[in-house]
Structures are given as structure tokens and as C-alpha cells.
Amino acid sequence: MPGAAAKGSELSERIESFVEALKRGGGRRSSEDMARETLGLLRRIITDHRWSNAGELMELIRREGRRMTAAQPSETTVGNMVRRVLRIIREEYGRLHGRSDESDQQESLHKLLTSGGLSEDFRSHYAQLQSNIIEAINELLVELEGTTENIAAQALEHIHSNEVIMTIGFSRTVEAFLREAARKRKFHVIVAECAPFCQGHEMAVNLSKAGIETTVMTDAAIFAVMSRVNKVIIGTKTILANGALRAVAGTHTLALAAKHHSTPLIVCAPMFKLSPQFPNEEDSFHKFVAPEEVLPFTEGDILEKVSVHCPVFDYVPPELITLFISNIGGNAPSYIYRLMSELYHPDDHVL
């Protein structure tokens, strides 16, 4: 069994390396990279570990999932992928167990709320369960690879010629969305710089290289400029269970200004960012970084007298959002609960 031991050791090292990277903040990895890497590790866990039935496998996935999410609670994509895999295990077990897909669907809100109490032991053994689960995970990985392209393909439905579009900070999804629209439409993009991180400058450079007329402005000018804007298009870190956003700091200000001027606010986000979390879960919601960009350490006299916090994310309530554009189409914030019931099982909301 030396081969199996070596494989197990290599997998443990990969998981440990991933957990350490999460603790350090994930570096420059995008949410899509995180999702893909999480799925890859879970697939290896399923193939390399020994388990005899779906119940044991789900407990194994939950244990590793808790370990990954505890390393960086604010990186909700990791937990979302763990829940997607748990849902896949339940569905594949149900098919082999002889339960039809229709009976497993939650076609009403009442059933969605009560289904958490219906438990199944998942103790029956099926030889082909592993291969079916791996195949479903591979399909999910293929789906992940096309998420940005699927969102960008909808750009021409929402962006029209000579419009003024506002965005904030840097988002790969929004950049792809605007680039796709620019292939056939001419429009002007205003980018709020998103201080103190100033990621908006990177966004503006990329859009300018694509031939899009782009202007960078300070966050303080958002309200003054909003009256000229036709649409606000933003990305987000997480879509919460109530249809709200956990987005980069400054987004709430932007959303309030858009609401005041009745400017549509569109959120471009793939489905893997949809999380069953609610905004009252403070440990996983808040993330603070060193406030050096706000108040440099050279300001010694002031530093002795003040305590400075630098939050990374804003909470944006659902009533400020007009439309979500995901890889499966456009939806209103009120429809999020339905999408969530299709992605995650109620028993898996808490790992």
C-alpha cells in the first residue's frame, strides 16, 4: 500500500497548502480560481479516501469543508462549492436509490422550509456512486469555466449606444461584460477608484486598452456625477441569502446614490457566489485589513490618539438592487431564495 500512502500524503499537503493560502487571504486568486481549486480538492478527496456509502462520504466532505471555511470565513466561495458537492452526493444517491428527480424538488416555499427536517440515513452501498459523483463534479467544473463568458454574452441586452455606465473598483466579470458590449456599441464608462485600495485604476487601464472611453473619479464624486449616469454595473464578492450583497467598500454609497437618482443598478455575478449566509453572521461577513493606506504609520502623533479600522466589504441591501445577471440569466433579488433552493440542500446550509 505504499502507493496509496503516497497519494494520501500528497493530497494532505495540497489541502494544507490551500488552507494556508486561505489564511493569508488567498493572494491574487479570483473567486473563480478559488471555486475551481476547491472542487479539484474535493474530487481528489472523494477518489483517494476510503468510504463505503453516501453518509460516510458526506461526513468526510463536511469535515474537510469546515476546515477550509474556518481558515478564511470571508471567502464564501469555498463553502458554496462544498455545499454544491454535498447536493450532488444527495442527488446521485437518490437516483441510485430509486427516488425520482421530481420527488426531490422543492416546488414551494413551505416545502423549502420544512424539508430540512426530512432526513435519510444514506447507508446503502452502491458501486457506481463514486463514478456518478465524479462525473457530476466534472460537469460542474466545465460550467465554472464558462461562467464569465455566459454573463458577458448578455451584455448587448443591457448596454446601449451612447450610454454612460458607472462601476466601482475592479471586477473581472464586469470587465468582460463591458468588453463584450464594446465590440458593437460605443459608450462611456466612469470608474470610481474605490479608495483606499484604488483598484478602479486597474479597471480603467484595462478598459482603455480595449478601446472603451473611460474616466476615473474619486469616491467622493459619486453622488455629483450620478445624475449623468444611465446604468450602474458592479460585481460583488457574495450574494447573500436575502438577495443583498457583500461587495467592496464604497458600493453601498454607490447604490444609495443610484437609488436617489432612480438609476438602475445591475450586479454581474456567477451562481457560485450565491451563499445561504445572512448578514447577521458577523465572523464571516466582516474583514478588516491594515489601515496604513488610510492613515500612514508616519503620522505618529495622530496614531497615538485614534483607533482606525479599515473594512474591506460593504453590506448592500436588496432593495437597492435592480437586477442580478448570472451565468443562467437575469433575476430580481426577490428570486434569490428560489435559486438557492436549486443549488443547496437546506440541511447543508450549516456545514
Curated annotation (Swiss-Prot):
GO cellular component terms, semicolon-separated: cytoplasm; cytosol; eukaryotic translation initiation factor 2B complex
Activity regulation, free text: Activated by the chemical integrated stress response (ISR) inhibitor ISRIB which stimulates guanine nucleotide exchange factor activity for both phosphorylated and unphosphorylated eIF2.
GO aspect biological process, one term: central nervous system development
Keywords: Cytoplasm, Initiation factor, Protein biosynthesis
Subcellular locations according to the entry: Cytoplasm, Cytosol
Organism domain of life: Eukaryota
Any one GO molecular function term: GTP binding
Pfam families named among the record's database cross-references: IF-2B (PF01008)
Principal place of residence: cytoplasm
Keyword Translocase (UniProt): no
Subunit structure: Component of the translation initiation factor 2B (eIF2B) complex which is a heterodecamer of two sets of five different subunits: alpha, beta, gamma, delta and epsilon. Subunits alpha, beta and delta comprise a regulatory subcomplex and subunits epsilon and gamma comprise a catalytic subcomplex. Within the complex, the hexameric regulatory complex resides at the center, with the two heterodimeric catalytic subcomplexes bound on opposite sides.
Task of the protein: Acts as a component of the translation initiation factor 2B (eIF2B) complex, which catalyzes the exchange of GDP for GTP on eukaryotic initiation factor 2 (eIF2) gamma subunit. Its guanine nucleotide exchange factor activity is repressed when bound to eIF2 complex phosphorylated on the alpha subunit, thereby limiting the amount of methionyl-initiator methionine tRNA available to the ribosome and consequently global translation is repressed.
Family: Belongs to the eIF-2B alpha/beta/delta subunits family.
Protein name in the entry: Translation initiation factor eIF2B subunit beta
Highest classification ranks of the organism: Eukaryota, Metazoa, Chordata, Craniata, Vertebrata
